């Protein structure tokens, strides 16, 4: 029974890692092998993905949803923002570092020769040097747990050989096995202050995900805008071509009338100048379309591959909205925005991290009060002559027999008289929380304005479509009337050409109103945090 106390102490020490392991283990997805994906480790950037799925008859045939999906898959800006999420995950992995176990070992050999200065050195004479050789072998293990408990265990052995005849054992081996734990009781003691960096790091990951969601929403809005810009540019080109065709038809009739003598020679220049002017508009519209398509290719990632960059785009969406036009009031839209905008989630996570930092700073103001307990088992072994008999002992048998124990208990107190570093840390945390509170208020103000503007733009677009359709109908009737009067000799070519110009302007205005409505719908979705909903997409699929 004389070994019961040491064995109990060792049992408790050995059980400590098992008792604390569930708390100190990383959560799923917080391990390096989970985070270091092949994409992260690759030193090359993958080419555009998924473009081949939309290749039809030598063209890229794209719906609006297709364009959004390709943007999220291939757009460089989206991938750069996604990298911020990955970076925050590795920062979380680094927050586990204080709890990593450490195993160290040491092997050292030293030999010395020195002249004797005393007969007690046992060399047998003044002309015989003192020769000694020491070999040291050590193994140490240490680990800190989320309770703040630091556990250390070590095993060391020293092999000493010296030409001293007074030594009982020569060579002799001294071995020690030691166990020690240190538990902070105030500052950095127990779970909260040690888990706080992990909590903050996890909040930062969640905040980066919310920020990425906001960037995805912005990228979707940009992709939608560029998609409809191509549709509008293509529609504008069609309007310009129809206007040119009408002017050329009028010019041909006037030229025929001039040949027959039914038109004064000077009147032909008006219709001829209109043909030239409208041809300029067609050229301008063609190059505006090219620029819009190049911008859309950049958004889709098609510019990254020369083959796909050279393909024509075939956009399947029509600007004229089908079905009932969307309606939403400002109050409902604002309520949705406050609940679903990812920017608010990012601010909430930042404020949560601020609260944790403040609590941690208060803990750092406490004095250091540490409880330390240690146990060591010593052993001495070697070969020597005792009472004229050859004797051999084992130091390892002695240390594991626990015959020569050493017990240590210590309570240490460190009381800073000012502790300015901790006070500065607390002040910084308080200022950070105040800054984030103002950020939340500023965000709420900006979102309120964004929602109001988006709803107003939607209502304006709906009214513009109705007015544009009426204006186009009247412009067509006016063109037909002026053309009929001119054919009957009651009108002038000036009025006919002016009516054609007004009709083209009405067509252009209606097209702009229709595209404006589509953009306004996308703007409402963006303002209310619903940008992903129309396309059945989730941000989690991009940040796994």
Segments the model singles out, each with a brief description of its role:
Residues 70-79, 86-101, 138-171, 180-197, ...:
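A glycine-/polar-enriched beta->alpha junction
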Residues 9-18:
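Bacterial N-terminal signal peptides
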Residues 95, 209-333, 457, 502-503, ...:
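Periplasmic alpha-helical coiled-coil/stalk elements that build and connect Gram-negative outer-membrane
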Residues 263, 267-268, 302-373, 377-378, ...:
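Amphipathic alpha-helical coiled-coil scaffold segments and their short linker/junction regions
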Residues 55-59, 107-179, 183, 315-326, ...:
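Small/polar, glycine/serine/threonine/aspartate-rich low-complexity segments that form flexible
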């Amino acid at each position: 029974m004389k070994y019961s106390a040491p064995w109990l102490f060792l049992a408790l020490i050995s059980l400590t890692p098992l008792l604390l392991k569930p708390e100190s283990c990383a959560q799923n997805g917080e391990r390096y092998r989970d985070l270091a994906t092949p994409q992260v480790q690759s030193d090359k950037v993958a080419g555009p993905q998924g473009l081949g799925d939309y290749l039809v008859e030598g063209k890229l045939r794209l719906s609006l949803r297709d364009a959004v999906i390709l943007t999220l898959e291939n757009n460089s800006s989206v991938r750069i923002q996604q990298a911020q999420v990955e970076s925050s995950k590795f920062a979380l992995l680094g927050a586990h570092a204080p709890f990593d176990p450490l195993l160290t070992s040491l092997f050292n050999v030293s030999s010395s020769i020195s002249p004797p200065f005393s007969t007690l050195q046992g060399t047998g004479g003044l002309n015989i040097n003192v020769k000694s050789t020491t070999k040291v072998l050590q193994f140490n293990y240490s680990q800190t747990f989320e309770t703040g408990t630091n556990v250390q265990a070590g095993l060391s052995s020293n092999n000493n050989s010296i030409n001293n005849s007074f030594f009982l054992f020569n060579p002799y081996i001294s071995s020690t096995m030691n166990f020690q734990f240190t538990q902070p009781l105030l500052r950095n003691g127990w779970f909260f202050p040690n888990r706080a960096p992990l909590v903050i790091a996890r909040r930062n990951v969640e905040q980066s995900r919310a920020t990425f969601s906001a960037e995805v929403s912005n990228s979707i809005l940009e992709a939608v805008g560029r998609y409809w810009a191509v549709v509008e540019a293509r529609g504008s080109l069609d309007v310009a071509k129809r206007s040119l065709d009408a002017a050329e038809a009028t010019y041909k009739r006037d030229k025929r009338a001039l040949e027959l003598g039914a038109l004064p020679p000077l009147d032909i220049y008006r219709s001829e100048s209109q043909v030239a002017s409208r041809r300029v508009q067609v050229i301008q519209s063609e190059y505006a379309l090219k620029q819009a398509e190049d911008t859309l290719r950049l958004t889709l990632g098609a510019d990254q591959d020369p083959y796909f960059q050279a393909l024509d785009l075939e956009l399947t969406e029509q600007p004229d909205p089908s079905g009932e036009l969307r309606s939403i009031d400002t109050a409902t839209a604002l309520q949705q925005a406050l609940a679903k905008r990812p920017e608010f989630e990012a601010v909430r996570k930042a404020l949560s991290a601020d609260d944790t930092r403040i609590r941690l700073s208060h803990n750092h103001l406490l004095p250091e009060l540490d409880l330390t307990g240690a146990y060591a088992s010593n052993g001495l072994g070697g070969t020597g002559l005792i009472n004229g008999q050859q004797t051999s002992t084992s130091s390892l048998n002695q240390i594991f027999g626990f015959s020569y124990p050493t017990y240590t208990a210590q309570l240490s107190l460190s009381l800073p008289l000012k502790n300015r570093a901790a006070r500065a840390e607390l002040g910084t945390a308080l200022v950070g929380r105040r800054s984030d509170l103002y950020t939340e208020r500023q965000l709420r103000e900006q979102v309120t304005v964004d929602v109001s503007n988006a709803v107003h733009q939607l209502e304006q677009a709906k009214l513009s479509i109705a007015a544009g359709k009426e204006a186009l109908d009247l412009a067509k009737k006016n063109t037909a009337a002026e053309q009929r009067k001119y054919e009957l000799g009651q009108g002038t070519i000036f009025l006919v050409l002016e009516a054609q110009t007004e009709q083209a302007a009405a067509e252009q205005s209606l097209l702009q109103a229709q595209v404006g409505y589509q953009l306004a719908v996308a703007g409402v979705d963006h303002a209310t945090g619903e940008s992903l909903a129309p396309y059945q997409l989730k941000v989690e699929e991009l940040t796994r």
